[in-house]
């Protein structure tokens, strides 16, 4: 079982006292801290043209995280595939794979904001098909062999993407479930990729989608299951109070971007993993009981506008939780 932290979005809500320079410094500091407390991975999200400066350049941010650490995995959660030149994306991913010795995961997904499609010059109805073609091209590019490609959106004459990657078959690709949920799960499974379930979904829906993914994936070597979760760990304050303001801002921002009515954010309406260390250990063990050793449990403990000293402490406590869960799993093995 693995443990990660994220997603980091570097948002600056109205009235925030923290500059974007400070927010990016905070990301790198927390990446080093995550490694120090023996967490396994660190994840960065992507959006574009957001008034709060939501992180847009995930590839260079991952490069900075990988350069600041020695063991930590860094991944995109997710890069919007249709906004990238697929050959250049392949070259960038291979460079990160080489520089880090295999510690980069390329998470890919689709978009939904009209402003992003308009700004990038992409027709929304082509987004999912473009994702499929980008993955086709990446798979070929990562072989280090000559290939050509003729798709609906991308045409590539015979090329060889060099140098070849450090990781056999190229850096791992994770596909996100942000579109039509069943189709997303089936795509990831049929293509033999890791699957990222939308962290806002309730557990029964997560369980159903993972089962759907497993059926489509059947017959291949088992991959880890990256399960992203919202929550917080605190031993000296109410964890919901610690995350409520920033989480509310985040969820209501997503409502606005998705063209939905802006909803009240109540603790009981969300799948949250929060509490003191012992409470979070119990919750994580329940997830492990359900999904097994392949579980890669990723917890978001940083929220827009939050005092970074509080999320620093939450990362430390999350590292404690990870160590406690590992010991408990070891005892019961």
Task: List each language-model region with its residue ranges.
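N-terminal beta1-alpha1-beta2 module of alpha/beta enzyme domains
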Residues: 1-68, 73, 169-171
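N-terminal small/glycine-rich loop or linker at the start of catalytic domains
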Residues: 1-18, 113, 155-171, 258-268, ...
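Hydrophobic faces of well-ordered beta-strands that scaffold small-molecule active sites
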Residues: 3-7, 42-44, 74-76, 104-108, ...
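An alpha-helical appendage that flanks or caps ligand/catalytic pockets
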Residues: 7, 36, 125-161, 204-296, ...
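Active-site mouth loops of central-metabolism enzymes
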Residues: 11-24, 79-87, 169-180, 269-277
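Conserved, mostly hydrophobic/aromatic
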Residues: 38, 46, 65, 96, ...
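Glycine-rich, proline-tolerant flexible connector loops at the mouths of alpha/beta enzymes
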Residues: 41-62, 80, 199-201, 299-310
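Internal, glycine-rich beta/alpha segment that forms the wall or movable "lid"
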Residues: 82, 88-191, 204-211
